[in-house]
Amino acid sequence: MSKTLYQKLYDAHVVYSAPEETPLLYIDRHLVHEVTSPQAFDGLRAMGRKVRQPGKTFATMDHNVSTQTKDINASGEMARIQMQELIKNCEEFGVLLYDLNHPYQGIVHVIGPEQGMTLPGMTIVCGDSHTATHGAFGSLAFGIGTSEVEHVLATQTLKQGRAKTMKIEVTGDAAEGITAKDIVLAVIGKTGSAGGTGHVVEFCGKAIQALSMEGRMTLCNMAIEMGAKAGLVAPDDTTFDYLKGRQFAPTGSNWEQAVAYWRTLKSDDDAKFDTVVTLRAEDIAPQVTWGTNPGQVIAVNQTIPAPESFSDPGERASAEKALAYMDLKPGIKLTEVPIDKVFIGSCTNSRIEDLRAAAAIAKGRKVASGVQAIVVPGSGPVKAQAEAEGLDKIFIDAGFEWRLPGCSMCLAMNNDRLNPGERCASTSNRNFEGRQGRGGRTHLVSPAMAAAAAIAGHFADIRDIH
């Protein structure tokens, strides 16, 4: 019987199934950070349990960390307690920790692939909704809650029902300057922020195959923003070239065996999907969100829609509420809207290619007066590589702030946040009310678009910048 990639991955990991019961899946990798793990480790301690497979569990500090200093006290008492608890728990339970002073420390969804912890065919979980990022490698990766974190620590398994399947095919070639961020925002604009609910999404088509691994990670990172459980891209030579030689990747004959297996990880030609969505890459322009969910998005050269243009009453009400919160008027272009802050970073867009794209716009230019622009590399190795290439100097000369790795302004859990009423061009993944700080207004864009906004002082079409 023909199977989708998701069905192959799911079936390969079922360790127990019975009628009227949710199947039990084996978990190959468990990634842990300071925010969703303390209660899980406390639960193990209370029951006298150990971590069943500490060698398959990896931890880092990212959500709470300061991006201006390595001082554990810098982000406040709650952050300090959570980070100190993680240090204690990893020491006690034998889990490898990339702490504040580790050269490889960074955002959990950046360091996993970077170190080769993420490999095709795996099941990967983390107490974080953007775990879908790792699906770029053809692995089944999804976020879990704290009680599930405890269950995986204790058993290396998790009960998980079958999801529906969705194929998103992006045909043709994207225009120059159109990135994975623009593609995925255009997809979410078409499906809506709940269009993928109950599904695992597989991205395919010529435009997807043309993406680098970093682009594919951006794509899968935001699968959750259309309501999907996970996102997938079938592994290919681009995947294998990226992984070869990384710290936790197989070596020697094990590598050859692994690649031979990984090549089988693709949907069969006649596999049936529950839902199919198709977009033409050549129709996709640089995207900017205007509302308070990622589905409220337009091309940079389009006008903000009027609520009455939505036929669905729920969408109409949502648009009215979003426009009021964002303090925007329908019928205007976002290129007329001034900004206060720019954030280049997050598990969506903080890798070396993202920083290169932003630096190419920033080079020889200056951040507009009154705009604060920060660049936050996703990990220690990304920061080191960017500095070796001189990108930090380009940003600093242009008036951007060059920071230490961390989740930073993606979410208001550290010192990097918006003040009430401030408007931000952000390369992160969520533009919900208050996401970047109470009363803050978030517009999601690609790294190049964020850099262009910093220079112009308002949103700008990168296609007009030479």
UniProtKB/Swiss-Prot annotation:
Keywords: 4Fe-4S, Amino-acid biosynthesis, Branched-chain amino acid biosynthesis, Iron, Iron-sulfur, Leucine biosynthesis, Lyase, Metal-binding. It comes from the Bacteria. It is an enzyme of class 4 (lyase). Binds 1 [4Fe-4S] cluster per subunit. CDD domains: IPMI. Pathway: Amino-acid biosynthesis; L-leucine biosynthesis; L-leucine from 3-methyl-2-oxobutanoate: step 2/4. [4Fe-4S] cluster binds at residues 347, 407, 410. It catalyses: (2R,3S)-3-isopropylmalate = (2S)-2-isopropylmalate. SUPFAM superfamilies: Aconitase iron-sulfur domain. Gene3D superfamilies: Aconitase, domain 3 (3.30.499.10). Its EC number is 4.2.1.33. Heterodimer of LeuC and LeuD. PANTHER family: 3-ISOPROPYLMALATE DEHYDRATASE (PTHR43822:SF9), HOMOACONITASE, MITOCHONDRIAL-RELATED (PTHR43822). HAMAP family: LeuC_type1 (MF_01026). Belongs to the aconitase/IPM isomerase family. LeuC type 1 subfamily. This is 3-isopropylmalate dehydratase large subunit. The lineage of its organism: Bacteria, Pseudomonadati, Pseudomonadota, Gammaproteobacteria, Enterobacterales.
